[in-house]
Amino acid sequence: METNTARKTILVVDDDPGVLDYASYVLEECGYAVLTAPDGAAALVLLRDHDQIDLLFTDVVMPGLDGVEVARRACQESPRLKVLFTTGYAADVIPAGRLLKKPYRPEQLAGEIAAVLANST
């Protein structure tokens, strides 16, 4: 499943350990470097500690800091950071941004990540 990723780094954030493991496995198989966080607070620490994160892939609905707030804070610090949201809930839970609905297949995740990374805006 490896793609031409130029070793981009993806931060995956999800409070469901099974989803976190699944997404990180799929992305590692695609050739990405992957960091994981089980919640929004841990994600913000990783974002501060690793300045080479190319994309934030975050669940929207999590206890504590939700994915929308994590993305807002992260993009304030790193305006070029790409963001892809995911949720099993209705798409209207995010104000704006790209969304991958759960459950997703490996090829859907890989395709959405590649598309977001390729988008220069």
Protein language model regions, located:
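Charged docking surfaces used in two-component/phosphorelay signaling
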Residues: D21-E29
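Short hydrophobic/Thr-rich beta-strand motif most characteristic of the beta2 strand and flanking loop
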Residues: G31-P38, L46
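Acidic catalytic/metal-coordinating carboxylates
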Residues: P38-A42, D66-V70
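Conserved phosphotransfer cores of two-component systems
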Residues: R48-D51, R73-L81, Y89-V93, G97-R98, ...
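Active-site residues of response regulator receiver
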Residues: D59
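Receiver (REC) domain active-site loop signature in two-component systems and cognate sites
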Residues: M62
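C-terminal output helix
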Residues: Y104-T121
